[in-house]
């Protein structure tokens, strides 16, 4: 980046993608400021690093900035954007700034409708275990680093490639993973699935001639594009044709054990793997990491250590531990938090929970995300949500969208009742969800909180309320009228 750029301001700095880029640039020596609509733990953490943060948007916040970075959530009439344009300060989309960062290193980009954050985190963890000290920008908090971004001294940068707004077409990686291609964010592609698949092909063709595409051929849509990809391809999955393949897959508590067969280029010895994550979908994510490791020549021992020692990502099957159950019988229930909000993600996570906690009643607390997704995936939501043993259903988190008739939480709850597999409890106000969980969960249950909206605050609140309820009652009380002292 030209050294005339010294001060970079972020509009919407509290977002997971924006905060990560801001932190890396700050650690590169740039002066960073940023604003967001509401205060958050992310804003407070960035302020603790020395980044100037503002709650709310105002033209004065961009004073002195040489460039202004925006996310797709920021509207064109935002006062900071308008002020920047009036002053002829460059307004840079988030993806272009990420692409600029990637020019500094060898870029590994993780794309796909589902699994990007977990896979990016696993790649970063294995590179770190190999002593390669990667830079990474992730859409979730990597627990081992305590952050969603890190500036490393090594040659590689690992990032998520976002297809939701087609911004991944701005990136120029040297290696790219595609985990899957599913019908989500279809408004970006004119509700044309063929256009979505073509965008992934175009993304892969952004790589240089020496680039490598690592593709999950278990996914039908990914299989469809393989013939169109002109760069070298390494396939992975459970199928016999996959060059990096998992066999002998089994769940052991909250972990997955399997053997990786590697036949990309030369046949390598089978590699026994312990993955510190549940679910077959995460085995596939790990296979892509193993394929990356083969391409980079990472020793097997580092791969095994990075996957077995993986400490997880915030809001990706994140355990909040045991919470005391109310009522009888006495005991506790387990609380798990997950960001999944698409039916495919939810089905995989529910299956992972069944595997990790066999024989236990599964209570799903779900907040749908976006009216358009609820409308477009309505029947799939009914099928998937019905796989839980009990359901607490919140109202749709709008994410800025106007309501759509018959695509709201109450209508979804009625459809679940008609389907007859489960009797949902509709919780209109997400603020009431923690108490609803405590009222409905029994000893021995697993409570799985899912959604991409404000439900992320619910698991912590459940723990907080339960802990307060278990405190010893105060020994002093106000005397009733007439009571002897």
Swiss-Prot record:
Belongs to the MurCDEF family. The keyword NADP does not apply. Its EC number is 6.3.2.8. SUPFAM superfamilies: MurCD N-terminal domain, MurD-like peptide ligases, catalytic domain, MurD-like peptide ligases, peptide-binding domain. Pathway: Cell wall biogenesis; peptidoglycan biosynthesis. It comes from the Bacteria. ATP binds at residues 112-118. This is UDP-N-acetylmuramate--L-alanine ligase. The lineage of its organism: Bacteria, Pseudomonadati, Pseudomonadota, Betaproteobacteria, Burkholderiales. It comes from Variovorax paradoxus (strain S110). Cell wall formation. One of its GO terms (biological process) is cell wall organization. The keyword Cell cycle applies. GO terms for cellular component: cytoplasm. HAMAP family: MurC (MF_00046). One of its GO terms (molecular function) is ATP binding. It catalyses: UDP-N-acetyl-alpha-D-muramate + L-alanine + ATP = UDP-N-acetyl-alpha-D-muramoyl-L-alanine + ADP + phosphate + H(+). It is found in: Cytoplasm. Keywords: ATP-binding, Cell cycle, Cell division, Cell shape, Cell wall biogenesis/degradation, Cytoplasm, Ligase, Nucleotide-binding, Peptidoglycan synthesis. It is an enzyme of class 6 (ligase). Pfam families: Mur_ligase, Mur_ligase_C, Mur_ligase_M.
